[in-house]
Design a protein with these regions (language model features):
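N-terminal leader/targeting and assembly helices and adjacent pre-domain segments
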Residues: 1-142, 187-193
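Aromatic/histidine-rich interaction motifs
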Residues: 130-168
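Short Cys/His-based metal-binding microdomains
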Residues: 153-189
Length: 193
């Protein structure tokens, strides 16, 4: 389901396309719910493979959404700066271990709500981690810090508010789940980009 603020905020064709992209990501996440609600075998490797079949497409969808947000907001084609397949390959073992550990705990203890929350968090964390590699490479030489706005008002538990050095920033330029917005400060100017 698309967050309410998205329905209120987006009115132009481009904005509606963005809203649709968010909805597609939500549909990917709904597959996790469907998985969690059905019966499972005791074969951890088999179950992990099924979860990864959901997580990899959702990871790519989430990444593509962030690239679109940056292109719309900053006119920077960040997807050309990041070799997505290469980074995903480098992170494959680590990512699959995280997913396997959570899947194993789910199969053993059966807490589907906790499992869905954990997988959503893994999806958000890994996407932002990969995405930021490209974003920081693009902005680190021209910007020195960023100002995060909306975090306090949005009440997002993952976000902070105020001035943050570029090297310490852990958010994408726009966080679609809570409307936190990051403005990058260009060195030697009073401008935020």
């Amino acid at each position: 389901m698309v967050p309410l603020f998205v329905k209120k905020r987006y009115n132009t064709p481009e904005e509606k396309a963005l809203s649709n992209a968010i909805e597609e990501l939500d549909e990917d996440k709904d597959k996790l719910v469907e998985y969690a609600e059905r019966p499972h075998s005791a074969d951890i490797d088999l179950e992990t493979k099924q979860v990864l079949g959901i997580m990899y497409p959702a990871l790519t969808e989430s990444y593509n959404l962030m690239c679109k947000l940056v292109k719309d907001e900053y006119d920077i084609n960040i997807s050309k700066k990041i070799d997505w397949d290469k980074i995903l390959y480098e992170k494959q073992d680590e990512f699959e271990k995280i997913v396997k550990d959570h899947t194993k705990a789910f199969i053993l203890f059966g807490d589907d709500n906790k499992f869905i929350r954990q997988m959503s968090l893994v999806l958000d964390t890994e996407t932002v981690s990969i995405f930021n590699k490209g974003m920081y490479e693009e902005l680190k030489d021209i910007c020195d810090y960023a100002i995060v706005t909306g975090a306090v008002e949005g009440g997002c538990p993952k976000c902070f508010h105020g001035e943050v050095p570029i090297a310490e920033l852990k958010l994408p330029p726009y966080h679609p789940r809570c409307e936190c917005i990051v403005r990058y400060h260009e060195k030697g100017t009073e401008e935020l980009v």
